[in-house]
Amino acid sequence: MAIRTFRPYTPGTRTRVVTDFNELTGRKPERSLVVSKHRLKGRNNRGVITCRHRGGGHKRLYRIVDFRRNKHDVPAKVAAIHYDPHRNARLALLFYSDGEKRYILAPAGIAIGQEVISGPKVPIETGNAMPLSAIPLGSSVHCVELYAGRGGQMVRSAGASAQVMAKEGDYVALRLPSTEVRLIRRECYATLGEVGNSEIRNTSLGKAGRRRWLGRRPQVRGSVMNPCDHPHGGGEGRAPVGRAGPVTPWGKPALGLKTRKRNKPSNRFVLRKRRRVSKRSRGGRDS
């Protein structure tokens, strides 16, 4: 997989960088694995906006992805690599030997015709799913379960992977993409390898319209609003915030405030906290 750049024929193509989609082998999704989905557009059950800057975008069909990998000891072959509009990773369509079809997250390097399998005693190969207790130290994994049988909940984004660091008792230590080291039960399943489509981090949408196609509406800075709309608003010209630090539209501290509870029960499973990301490297906007 590679990325594609464009000549500056228009302002929208000047900075546009996209993946070339050459790894995709099927244009239409498997009909038995798609369902219609009503998009909430950032609203809750009362119609109140709970997540700003969401709405519009192209119509989508939701692909049913197998995060549990609970079809043990039944081999499957990779039939196709498909696009998924709901995530930045690709999907691998599996044809099981008993005739069932399922989607899984496509690992990096997986090929058409490759055989994958899940179970407690399966070969150590990319795409195979097994308990953390059976995975060698130093291996890269993705789609990691946080609770046994619930399905993969962590490390599912494109290019992401976690590393098996140590095993002790009933727990396995994983180094997550955030650099946090966390203990997870040894019976939890994970898939070997890293998630594919890692070049997505080097892409650029190029224009505002392409962002609208994805269902993202404009983000207006608080400093250009009126005082009745945002704590940063008002003043003559480019006025400063007027507070000790930036705040959200509801007056809560923004950009750097820790929101995790100090006495959260799961803190005992965190061996090393994640690295703090500076404001400059985060590239955040005025709230």
UniProtKB/Swiss-Prot annotation:
Keyword Transmembrane helix belongs to the record: no
Q: Spans of biased composition, class Basic residues? A: 258-287
Superkingdom, natural source: Bacteria
Segment Disordered: which positions?
Answer: 221-287
What is any one of the record's Gene Ontology cellular component terms?
large ribosomal subunit
Q: Which UniProt keywords apply?
A: Ribonucleoprotein, Ribosomal protein, RNA-binding, rRNA-binding
Sorted alphabetically, the Gene Ontology BP terms of this entry are: translation
Q: Which InterPro entries match?
A: NA-bd_OB-fold, Rib_uL2_dom2, Ribosomal_uL2, Ribosomal_uL2_bac/org-type, Ribosomal_uL2_C, Ribosomal_uL2_CS, Ribosomal_uL2_dom3, Ribosomal_uL2_RNA-bd_dom
Q: Give one Pfam family.
A: Ribosomal_L2
- Provide the assembly information: Part of the 50S ribosomal subunit. Forms a bridge to the 30S subunit in the 70S ribosome.
Family assignment? Belongs to the universal ribosomal protein uL2 family.
Q: What does this protein do?
A: One of the primary rRNA binding proteins. Required for association of the 30S and 50S subunits to form the 70S ribosome, for tRNA binding and peptide bond formation. It has been suggested to have peptidyltransferase activity; this is somewhat controversial. Makes several contacts with the 16S rRNA in the 70S ribosome.
Task: Return the protein name.
Answer: Large ribosomal subunit protein uL2
Q: Which organism is it from?
A: Prochlorococcus marinus (strain MIT 9211)
